[in-house]
A protein has these predicted regions:
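Nucleotidyltransferase catalytic core that binds NTPs
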Residues: 1-162
Length: 162
């Protein structure tokens, strides 16, 4: 049986830390779905269509990576897709408590789904989408922290605000 994994997140924006986890996950699992969360409570920098477009473009040459969207409970989505594994990235100890709680709740909701934690390459351990958005909003450079396409789209957004 092929192993299907789901890597969920808002990916607003997609960072090189995310890309690192996804590409390494693609080597570990037969297929990995980048599942972009629809969250009506957040005001995203990029629209859902933009985030999907970016992710599909970044992984266009990696056939084992699929990009999809979901809303609602992650374990319900994972079950509907027939996946066996949730992939989560851990950058620092500060991520662990939240991820630990989420994993325990997911296990309670569906014992058939496993969670695998992956550490990003050390050069990406401090990068988060929130930090990228903050640096961008204050006029800072994010080169090397996000895929080139994300950097271009950020520049476009900055130009539209001027």
């Amino acid at each position: 049986m092929a192993t299907l994994a789901v890597y969920p997140g808002s990916f607003d924006p997609l960072t090189n830390g995310h890309v690192d986890i996804i590409l390494r996950g693609a080597r570990l699992f037969d297929r990995i779905i980048v599942a972009i969360l629809v969250n009506a409570e957040k005001a995203p920098l990029f629209t859902m269509a933009e985030r999907v477009d970016i992710a599909r473009a970044v992984f266009k040459d990696t056939p084992s990576v699929e990009v999809d969207t979901f809303e609602g409970l992650l374990v319900d989505y994972v079950g509907r897709r027939g996946a066996q594994v949730i992939v989560r990235g851990l950058r620092a100890v500060s991520d662990f408590e939240f991820e630990f709680q989420m994993t325990l709740m997911n296990q309670r909701l569906n014992r058939q789904i496993e969670t695998v934690f992956m550490m990003p390459d050390e050069k990406y351990t401090y990068i988060s989408s929130r930090l990228i958005k903050e640096v961008f909003a204050l006029g800072g450079q994010v080169h090397g922290l996000v895929p080139d396409m994300v950097e271009d789209r950020l520049r476009d957004k900055r130009a539209m605000r001027v």
